[in-house]
Amino acid sequence: MGILGLSKLIADLAPQAIRESEMKHFFGRKVAIDASMCLYQFLIAVRSEGAQLATVNGDPTSHLMGMFYRTIRLLDNGIKPVYVFDGKPPDLKSGELAKRAERREEAEKALKAATDAGDDAEIEKFNRRLVRVTKEHAREAKELLSLMGVPYVDAPCEAEAQCAALVKAGKVYATATEDMDALTFGSTKLLRYLTYSEARKMPVKEFSYDKLLEGLEVNNREFIDLCILLGCDYCESIKGIGPKRAIELINNYRDIETILDNLDTSKYTVPENWNYKVARELFIEPEVADASAIDLKWTEPDEEGLVKFLCGDRQFSEERVRNGAKKLLKSKHAQTQVRLDSFFKTLPSTPNAVHAAKRKAEEAKKSANNKKAKTSGGAARGRRPK
């Protein structure tokens, strides 16, 4: 689910935090990619196009085709991807997972009804809703990435949290996912639509964490409370409070505790036994592997290994796989070029960096105004300025 309404709220109140760019703009960047989100996109895309990509036994291979060719495209554009896979979901997510299971059951019933009625459009719609990424999909994707020479990380818990940890440690430039909660976990940069197909012609949308905090006039802790009010995967939200009201409450009271002390409960319904404090701590201190100890290496592809893995039972074209392997090798050798900013050391981000910078800017502005006032006073007493 991510964070409900956050993208639009940022677009409305902190548009300076969003920049749209072509993929080539990120040449030379290392990017942590939410692997499960990617695999889901690939499975959904193939269904919507009506294609049937499968092994001789009928097992789907669309996730492998998507991973193979989309990764090649990223590398062709000078981007060095590292894929991050989900671990076990946190206990707090059990409520959201239960809701998803209920929606799945409803979709299965609706699919049966659509099938009985012979409604192709409805059949397609509910088939898409039943798509999910399995452990086998993830296992095969990891094997493919190893053969391609592309690194991956197994997160102990949420992939978005691990991606954010890699960004904060300076290991990668940004998190690439469609889930906005990567920002709630503190990723200083979030890229949306990076792994979309070229045919969709969607520019990459880059969100800056520091700029959105400044635009929304909140610090990192207040931003987390805002996201909980908007609606996250880890607890319920207060009924009746939408994005506009949520940011007003945070700007007025600064935290959920004070909001609850001043909330009109006849107008808004607070969930019983609301776990917002535990959800807050999960965002502040998520379960992640030590990012500073993770060694990311991009190696040469194993062409013969790729042919053996993708061709045969999986029915990929050997010619296309070999051409893909050659592109991988070419892109690896071409990536000796570096971005100019890579010559300067990137320090791991700190949550309050934006506020320190803001204070510094305000002090500089105040100092400049004082100097201007003195200069103006001098001009009044001396020669009339031309």
From Swiss-Prot:
A GO term for molecular function: magnesium ion binding
Cofactor: Mg(2+)
Record EC number: 3.1.-.-
Region annotated Interaction with PCNA, chain positions: 336-344
Ligand binding (DNA): R47, R70, E158, G231, D233
Region feature Disordered, mapped onto this chain: 351-386
Pfam families to which the protein is assigned, alphabetical: XPG_I (PF00867), XPG_N (PF00752)
Main location: nucleus
Cofactor note: Binds 2 magnesium ions per subunit. They probably participate in the reaction catalyzed by the enzyme. May bind an additional third magnesium ion after substrate binding.
Post-translational modification comment from the UniProt entry: Phosphorylated. Phosphorylation upon DNA damage induces relocalization to the nuclear plasma.
Name this polypeptide is given: Flap endonuclease 1
Binding residues for Mg(2+) 1: D34, D86, E158, E160
Binding site for Mg(2+) 2: D179, D181, D233
Complex and partners: Interacts with PCNA. Three molecules of FEN1 bind to one PCNA trimer with each molecule binding to one PCNA monomer. PCNA stimulates the nuclease activity without altering cleavage specificity.
GO cellular component, one term: nucleoplasm
Ranges where the record places region N-domain: 1-104
InterPro entries in the cross-refs: 5-3_exonuclease_C_sf (IPR036279), Flap_endonuc (IPR023426), HhH2 (IPR008918), PIN-like_dom_sf (IPR029060), XPG-I_dom (IPR006086), XPG/Rad2 (IPR006084), XPG_CS (IPR019974), XPG_DNA_repair_N (IPR006085)
I-domain: annotated segments: 122-253
PROSITE patterns xrefs: XPG_1, XPG_2
GO terms (BP aspect): base-excision repair; DNA replication, removal of RNA primer
Alphabetic keyword roster: DNA damage, DNA repair, DNA replication, Endonuclease, Exonuclease, Hydrolase, Magnesium, Metal-binding, Mitochondrion, Nuclease, Nucleus, Phosphoprotein
Functional summary from the UniProt entry: Structure-specific nuclease with 5'-flap endonuclease and 5'-3' exonuclease activities involved in DNA replication and repair. During DNA replication, cleaves the 5'-overhanging flap structure that is generated by displacement synthesis when DNA polymerase encounters the 5'-end of a downstream Okazaki fragment. It enters the flap from the 5'-end and then tracks to cleave the flap base, leaving a nick for ligation. Also involved in the long patch base excision repair (LP-BER) pathway, by cleaving within the apurinic/apyrimidinic (AP) site-terminated flap.
